[in-house]
């Protein structure tokens, strides 16, 4: 007695099992988290170290190099990159997916602490954070007021909003855009300092002496104890202005005599505006792999409770929220599930024309899908675009077994058997075929589970979701389906009006197939050249269809990055960015908000568009118009960018090509020629390279002999310049319970040209004031403003945006061609960002594809106890792939992760049809019918179930092919590939399988 017979004989048991599946499914669904995609972010740790005033070369040699040298030995590092720029070193360490984020952070902290002894004494201690320094924020809270200054708003943002938001679980960091943090700025006048015989070093020494508070002990009496506190710290502008710098000739020289103290912003070279209004923005950056929706919900909740703590005149709003796209995208896929369910039920009814028979699959579909949610919960998965796509695809799949089982039982009832007898016999006949097709389908997705890297992580949930649905649907098809069939199905003495009207069509279809199949089998040799033609078509189209990682989605967001030429001032770039902002306002009426930010050296205009349903133009069309418009603004450079589907790095273009060399001189030599060819290439719309050699610098050459004769050391000169020009932190002061920096430098207007250095004086060891001009010579030069390393090598990363109609695959091929023409043997190339993921995923998917074919062949060989019979089924695979590629090419689709997974799915889907025919033909042969007649009869008998299951799969996927709204492009890519493959393969399989079977299969009638 098999499980189907047991369910028929014990219907209550079968019902209880079904209720348990539904119950656990609902419980699992209620506990599942929601996110856009499965967690595929590599663990990334950033190390940042500041050394104010130091140039890129000093930072590279004294900070970046020792840190990298120590970090490099940590196991599990995937890549390590660094940027050494003016005053700061930033190292980004990316680990393999298998490495735990906490373990990685601890390893890096350990290595950084060991390296600290090699760093300059006066640099800030390195900080280690669990996030990419270039990670994209997911949400921005804006803070504005018509009564308060940006300094006050920044304080509110820091003390109230940031403090609350950074404690949210899985938040890596909270930044304040446009922050004007309080600082005590000491502006020094070099002429007055020279008159009083004061140097910047004297100011630093005076602060170290006077702005100090040390523990002073206590006074103990017989009954009381008093703690002594020496009030040595300065808090107000007046106290700093009254600071005694030195005493000379019975005269006290105060800071106010040689300069002034004022409470001002720490960073004077940055600002942020939203919709033209200056304000500050608090942005939230998630940890790698964090659930963005959970974080956003927590932010909304905290902001709601925080409103009562904010002053009445302070208004908060949301500048952007990336999770709106995620929520809408998930809702769109949910809607598709319902559409697919309705379409599948309609097609089943049209084929069976009996509401009782149709009711059985109607029950099986929800049972299979709801039960899948419990398996997803047990596996630790989430509700995301891919797991929901798995549910959509499952709607058409899970119904197949139920249809085949129900139809087989119904045929017997119509022949006059009792429902119970028909159920037992019908289930027994189809039992093996149901298990075979299900095992085959699971075998397709099994290789995906073992795929490494981002692709494997992405589609693990997808493949496990479908596999889980197939397992539950198989169980339902073998238990509840035969039980329901015996309870619901009865022999119809009189056919319905609808049945009578439509039956001639089905009879005619059967007769047409019988005639055409007989004709095809008489010329069955045609099948072989037809398969060869399909294989050739696959080879041609596979190369012809452009490839990319994933199609670009309309996320209702566009970003424009602005860059000034090296040496351009902050004010120059600010004016240019505001010009771009005005351009956006005039060209994009669909903009909901426009946020402009400028800091030293770079600017950004971020456009949040209205929802897709509310505008006529797509994000891509708007970006195309903006790209053309910003090219006319030639005072500086602007790049229009759109966020990639699988990407979190801020502001990166799709093509990231890294050139590595052993010396900076070789890069300087080769880069101009390489970039010229990139600019001339029609494949790229725009291009840039991070390594520049154009930042002007004034080099100070010290006359050491003269300096030593006059009693001035190199250290004296360097310190005087450091404290006078670099805006060096000279200490801290406290205000409102918070610590702020004391910054000192010479007035900007008194040091705006190299000749102004003459007015700076240095004190000799004899106490004499010596003009710096007597000891140094000035030499103007150019140098790289930033130095880059990639995997320890000096590097330059060429970033390129793609021309219209071009894909990342074509872009990388073009870069490879230019590199082959331009670079010598002493260069190495590497890929970064989306480019690296694309190349790795391509090879990974090809491995999964070949493994799926091999696994299915082996499983079928085991099922049929023959190495020949599976060949009949496997030869239908080229038909499906060719169909998919033809439909993709006709609809302008690219070869991407979604379409490739669809193609892998097709292997299992078309194999199902072949199994049904071959299994029945083998049974007929064993009953004594010869091979040719057996395959003819089996094909005719299986025609309706094959057409019905294929039509249900196709219609279940049809909503994907016409998807609109958020995240539609990925769904369309997958839908077109699978529907195209199914349409072509279903029509051809009905003829090719019988023809190949007659040639290849084992002759069982003689046994």
Language-model features, listed with the residues they occupy:
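C-terminal transmembrane helical bundles of large multi-pass transporters
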Residues: 632-1007
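Membrane-proximal extracytoplasmic
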Residues: 1-341, 383, 457, 636, ...
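Juxtamembrane segments of multi-pass membrane proteins
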Residues: 531-629, 633, 638, 674, ...
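Transmembrane alpha-helices and their membrane-interface boundaries in multi-pass membrane transporters
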Residues: 395-409, 431-450, 457-499, 605, ...
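Interfacial segments of transmembrane alpha-helices in multi-pass membrane proteins
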Residues: 5-12, 288-291, 327-384, 450-454, ...
């Amino acid at each position: 007695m098999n499980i189907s017979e047991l369910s028929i004989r014990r219907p209550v048991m079968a019902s209880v099992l079904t209720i348990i599946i539904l119950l656990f499914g609902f419980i699992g669904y209620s506990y599942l988290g929601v996110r856009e995609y499965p967690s595929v972010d590599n663990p990334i740790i950033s190390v940042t170290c500041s050394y104010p005033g130091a140039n890129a070369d000093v930072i590279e040699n004294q900070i970046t190099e020792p840190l990298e040298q120590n970090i490099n030995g940590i196991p599990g590092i995937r890549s390590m990159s660094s940027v050494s720029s003016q005053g700061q070193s930033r190292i980004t360490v990316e680990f393999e997916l298998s490495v735990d984020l906490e373990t990685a952070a601890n390893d890096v902290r350990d290595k950084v602490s060991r390296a600290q002894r090699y760093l300059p004494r006066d640099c800030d201690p390195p900080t280690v954070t669990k996030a990419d320094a270039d990670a994209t924020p997911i949400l921005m809270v804006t803070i504005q007021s018509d009564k308060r200054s940006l300094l006050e708003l920044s304080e509110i943002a820091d003390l109230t909003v940031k403090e609350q938001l950074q404690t949210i679980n899985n938040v890596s960091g909270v930044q304040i855009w446009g922050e004007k943090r309080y600082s005590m700025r000491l502006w020094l006048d070099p002429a007055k300092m020279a008159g009083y015989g004061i140097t910047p070093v004297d100011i630093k020494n005076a602060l170290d002496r006077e702005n100090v508070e040390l523990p002073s002990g206590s006074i103990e009496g017989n009954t009381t104890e008093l703690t002594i506190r020496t009030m040595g710290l300065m808090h107000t502008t007046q106290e700093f202005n009254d600071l005694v710098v030195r005493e000379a000739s019975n005269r006290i020289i105060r800071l106010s005599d040689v300069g002034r103290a004022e409470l001002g912003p720490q960073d004077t070279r940055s600002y942020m505006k939203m919709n033209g209004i200056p304000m500050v923005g608090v942005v939230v950056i998630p940890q790698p792999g964090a659930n963005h929706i959970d974080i956003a919900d927590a932010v909304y909740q905290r902001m709601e409770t925080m409103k009562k703590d904010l002053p009445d005149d302070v208004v908060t709003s949301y500048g952007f929220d990336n999770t709106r796209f995620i929520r809408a995208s998930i809702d769109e896929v949910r809607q598709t599930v319902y559409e697919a369910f309705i379409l599948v039920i309609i097609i089943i009814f049209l084929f069976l024309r009996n509401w009782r028979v149709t009711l059985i699959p109607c029950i099986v579909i929800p049972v299979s899908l709801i039960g899948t949610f419990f398996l997803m919960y047990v596996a630790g998965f989430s509700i995301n675009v891919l797991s929901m796509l798995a549910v959509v695809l499952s709607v058409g799949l899970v119904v197949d077994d139920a249809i085949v089982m129900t139809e087989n039982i119904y045929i017997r009832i119509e022949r006059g058997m009792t429902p119970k007898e028909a159920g037992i016999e019908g289930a027994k006949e189809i039992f093996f075929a149901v298990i075979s097709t299900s095992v085959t389908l699971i075998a397709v997705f099994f290789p995906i589970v073992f795929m490494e890297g981002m692709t494997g992580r992405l589609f693990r949930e997808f493949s496990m979701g479908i596999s889980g649905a197939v397992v539950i649907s198989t169980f339902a098809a073998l238990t509840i389906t035969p039980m329901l069939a015996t309870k619901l199905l009865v022999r119809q003495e009189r056919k319905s009006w609808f049945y009578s009207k439509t039956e001639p069509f089905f009879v005619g279809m059967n007769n047409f197939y019988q005639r055409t199949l007989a004709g095809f089998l008489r010329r069955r040799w045609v099948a072989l050249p037809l398969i060869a033609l399909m294989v050739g078509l696959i080879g041609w189209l596979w190369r012809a269809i452009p490839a990319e990682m994933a199609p670009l989605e309309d996320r209702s967001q566009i970003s424009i990055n602005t860059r000034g030429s090296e040496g351009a001032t902050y004010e120059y770039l600010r004016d240019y960015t505001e010009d771009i902002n005005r351009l956006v306002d005039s060209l994009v009426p669909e903009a909901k908000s426009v946020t402009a930010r400028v800091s030293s050296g770079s600017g950004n205009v971020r456009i949040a568009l209205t929802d897709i349903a509310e505008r006529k133009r797509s994000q891509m069309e708007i970006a195309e118009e903006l790209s053309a418009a910003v090219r006319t603004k030639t005072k500086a450079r602007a790049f229009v960018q759109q966020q990639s589907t699988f990407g979190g790095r801020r502001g990166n273009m799709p093509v990231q090509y890294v050139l590595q060399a052993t010396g900076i001189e070789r890069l300087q030599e080769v880069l101009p020629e390489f970039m010229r060819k990139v600019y001339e290439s029609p494949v790229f719309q725009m291009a840039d390279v991070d390594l520049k050699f154009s930042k002007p610098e004034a080099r100070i050459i010290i006359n050491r002999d003269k300096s030593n004769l006059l009693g001035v050391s190199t250290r004296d000169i360097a310190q005087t310049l450091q404290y006078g020009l670099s805006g060096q932190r000279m200490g801290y002061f406290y205000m409102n319970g918070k610590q702020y920096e004391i910054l000192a430098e010479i007035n900007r207007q008194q040091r705006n040209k190299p000749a102004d250095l003459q007015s700076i004086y240095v004190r000799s060891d004899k106490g004499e004031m010596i003009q710096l001009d007597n000891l140094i010579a000035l030499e103007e030069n150019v140098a790289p403003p930033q130095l880059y390393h990639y995997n320890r090598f000096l590097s330059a990363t060429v970033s390129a945006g793609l021309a219209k109609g071009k894909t990342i695959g074509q872009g990388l091929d073009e870069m490879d061609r230019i590199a082959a023409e331009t670079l010598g043997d002493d260069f190495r190339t590497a890929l970064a960002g989306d480019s690296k993921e694309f190349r790795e995923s391509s090879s990974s998917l090809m491995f999964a594809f070949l493994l799926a074919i091999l696994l299915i062949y082996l499983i079928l060989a085991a099922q049929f106890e023959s190495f020949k019979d599976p060949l009949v089924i496997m030869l239908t695979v080229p038909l499906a792939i060719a169909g998919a590629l033809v439909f993709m090419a006709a609809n302008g689709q690219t070869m991407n992760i979604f379409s490739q997974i669809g193609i892998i799915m097709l292997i299992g889907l078309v194999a199902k049809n072949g199994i049904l025919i071959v299994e029945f033909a083998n049974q007929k042969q064993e009953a004594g019918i010869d091979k040719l007649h057996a395959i003819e009869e089996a094909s005719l008998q299986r025609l309706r179930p094959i057409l019905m299951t294929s039509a249900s799969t196709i219609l279940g996927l049809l909503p994907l092919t016409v998807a609109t709204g958020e995240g539609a492009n990925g769904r369309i890519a997958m839908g077109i590939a699978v529907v195209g493959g199914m349409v072509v393969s279903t029509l051809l399989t009905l003829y090719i399988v019988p023809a190949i079977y007659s040639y290849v299969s084992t002759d069982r009638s003689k046994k």
